[in-house]
């Protein structure tokens, strides 16, 4: 940055901008900017000479922007456009001064939800945002993550000036079988992973914003496939069958009562049990979705899609799933949105609106219309099982891998061991809900926290003993998967049946010297997961201390919040223990990373979230080598670089550190 703004100052600015988002800023420097800054005063501060700022200022001056104290949904076209106009302004800033000034100015003038969304995606995608850790959304907009009962208690605590920590219970009762797995869909870390992935890979992204989102369509498939597979693992751990796919012409069996409220806009709508899909005014007719689906099935059966100019594009090739993901979601990368529509996005809005499909009661959007809250609704996983089966039809159209495809010559995996027991348990996690309550002139803030039960596991280490029978050192890619052995009825699954339910535990690159070698890898280093985020309070303290002490701030370990929470790497399992197959596939790292920064430890969460602004670090299809049909298990068993062992995971009801 030309002004030499350090990470500590940037972090402090972002903290201040997001503090008490529903109230005017209390920080004098930001207040001064908000009153006196003119976004069009000096257009040389922007790369586009102020074109984006001019467009947004026109909307503001014409009183066309959504008012404050109103709900915001990304699935609402106009509201999304407004948020993106602010993103465009911030994204065009050359220096931090411009970024900070515009953010402070529009914070006081734009809808709070639009502002938060625009600020988050700008920090994620702009070079100026490097080094900044975005505070956990569950502390910035707690209403989206916390049930109404707890928010009410928070108000009471504030008014009576009594600090408090309040227990959040999962929705539903024991009469509802789905309640057994509510801890998964309602986990605040899982919600953050889902909402952040959609910020990292937004549907609206165009390369003119600065770079290409590599393999976005394929990652859309893989991330949601893994969420669904993980949900099925949790169901298996709770004596439930795998989630059933959604059908447009059948009833939606499971209703959902979210028991959460918007900060402004009333309660999230309830959907009763056993309702038929209805057309939704202003969104779509059910029949439209059936037509869209049949066109996608046609493309898979033909092996090609038709682009908007009428040309055919072959999808029976490695990049095929990428093209398919883009049209199913759909994103701006879709080859032909007019013809293939937007199956996933429209379906989210359709499900969100089933409580009030004709706008008769003027209800706000449902939980499915926010990425923060979508996974709470059991129908989210039914919708994604439906999408997942479309992708499976495509991957099943490829020939199975042969021995030669899978072999990494000279590389032998001799054994796999786990150092440490695979034990899961629930523990308590606290987060602040101070931002949920309003501040009065004379009412001091008191500590108000929500306490939730979250799944966790003991740390463990993989020990992979192997032999590299080649002359020299080789770069290897280690791919680790956990696969079910039996279904919910105790029937043994073939590998071909199990492979689609496997979950990715880790993927890493490592040089293996010639001769025998033992590779050790800690569960906490997984490229699939992220650690718990620092609290907003902790981010504020660290930034303030660094600024006051004149030293810089390095929070790079937390820079990405896209990734499965560390604590949820393993499925819960059962108290008596469950057995699973642990697969380790070692593949040729030079081929896998050809054309990339080979052998470099990408760290972070590249397995499901890629690397910002760079090509995806692995050339193989996501899910390799289990993503294609395996009619004959002997092919997998016959290569020396792939091995599996049976592991046992036990759930402890009482946890003692």
Curated annotation (Swiss-Prot):
Residues at which Cu cation B binds: 344, 348, 384
Subunit description: Hexamer of a number of different chains, of which A, B, and C have been identified.
Effect on the protein of changing residue 122 to G: In minor component B'
Gene3D superfamilies membership: Di-copper center containing domain from catechol oxidase, Hemocyanin, C-terminal domain, Hemocyanin, N-terminal domain
Signal peptide: none
Compartment(s): Secreted, Extracellular space
Record keywords, A-Z: Copper, Disulfide bond, Glycoprotein, Metal-binding, Oxygen transport, Secreted, Transport
Protein name (database record): Hemocyanin B chain
Tissue: Hemolymph.
Superkingdom of origin organism: Eukaryota
Result for mutant: residue 130 to K: In minor component B'
Record: glycosylation sites: 167
Outcome of substituting residue 49 to Q: In minor component B'
GO molecular function, one term: oxidoreductase activity
Variant or mutagenesis effect after changing residue 32 to E: In minor component B'
